[in-house]
């Protein structure tokens, strides 16, 4: 990887320009999302669903007949009512969760197990880009927790509590980013350690945590499908640059410019949701243990993310961190 490639997502300006450029690149679609790709009778959970991409995904899945559970930190119940109106589907439910808090994740899983399991589709969408480092209740760095580690905890709790459909292969979808290609290497010695940073470092760390997430998705697929049989379909994707509120913590001086650029060049959440809905609903992915999309095009993930040794190391460190936090 060249130095210029490494810098693509390392600051807000280069990340924005890269996003705009990627939108204009010619793409070969993996397939087409058809009106007949229905989800009637399926139970879907979308996290981070109160706004932006997550809200659009929840609405899109509801329109296809799914029973939709929106797991959110805010927007309860008004966002669920809005999805009902937009989709014409009344089978919409909202659950509270704060993905920066391990205890809140545990409570969410308890509610899912009692009232909503088995899940057929899970969309892990929640993510943040904070303007500076913040500590969680457990003393972790918040973006590390929300953008990666919460997914590890959440997925393993769902699996331990048998919250997925065990008859038909469920689909687990991670909203990742092409910025996962930017980090030069893993920083295993720093894993889980709290470190101070300001907005200038946020974009770089965002890409690093997306690398952790994409590596986790690859390793999860290998562990859930050990003998070549697809028991779970694990998908990851970059929806491209989205006109959402993920940059809401940017310095105030930049917000008017960002809003203008996002509005002109970036995709609306409803358009950006199409590849997520495609992965959730299309028969094109039946029987597939893993796939990665950029927009609507199939791509291979970065070799660092697909390397089984890196996957095993990430899993080992994540398990050790979870065990340590449980004994505190």
Predicted regions and their residues:
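C-terminal helical subdomain
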Residues: 236, 260-300, 308-312
């Amino acid at each position: 990887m060249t130095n210029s490639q490494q810098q693509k997502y390392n600051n807000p300006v280069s990340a924005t320009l890269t996003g705009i450029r990627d939108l204009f690149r010619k793409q070969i679609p993996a397939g087409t999302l058809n009106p007949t790709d229905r989800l009637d009778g399926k139970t879907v959970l979308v996290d981070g669903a109160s706004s932006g991409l997550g809200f659009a995904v929840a609405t899109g899945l509801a329109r296809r007949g799914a029973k939709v559970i929106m797991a959110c930190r805010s927007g309860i119940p008004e966002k669920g009512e809005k999805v009902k109106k937009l989709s014409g589907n009344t089978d919409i439910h909202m659950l509270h969760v704060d993905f920066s808090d391990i205890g809140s994740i545990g409570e969410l899983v308890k509610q899912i197990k009692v009232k909503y399991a088995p899940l057929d589709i899970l969309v892990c969408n929640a993510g943040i880009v904070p303007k500076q480092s913040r500590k969680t209740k457990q003393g972790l760095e918040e973006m590390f927790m929300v953008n990666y580690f919460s997914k590890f905890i959440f997925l393993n709790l769902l699996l331990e509590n048998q919250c997925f459909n065990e008859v038909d292969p469920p689909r687990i979808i991670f909203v990742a980013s092409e910025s996962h290609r930017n980090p030069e290497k893993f920083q295993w010695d720093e894993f889980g350690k709290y470190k101070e940073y300001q907005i200038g470092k946020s974009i770089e760390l965002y890409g690093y945590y997306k690398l952790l997430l994409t590596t986790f998705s690859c390793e999860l697929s290998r562990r859930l499908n050990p003998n070549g049989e697809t028991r779970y379909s694990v998908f990851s994707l970059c929806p491209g640059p989205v006109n959402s509120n993920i940059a809401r913590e940017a310095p105030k001086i930049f917000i008017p410019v960002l809003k203008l650029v996002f509005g002109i060049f970036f995709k609306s959440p409803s358009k950006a949701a199409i590849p997520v809905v495609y992965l959730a609903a299309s028969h094109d992915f039946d029987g597939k243990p893993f796939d990665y999309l950029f927009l609507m095009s199939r791509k291979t993930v970065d070799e660092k993310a697909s390397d089984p040794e890196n996957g095993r190391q990430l899993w080992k460190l994540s398990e050790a961190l979870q065990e340590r936090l449980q004994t505190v």
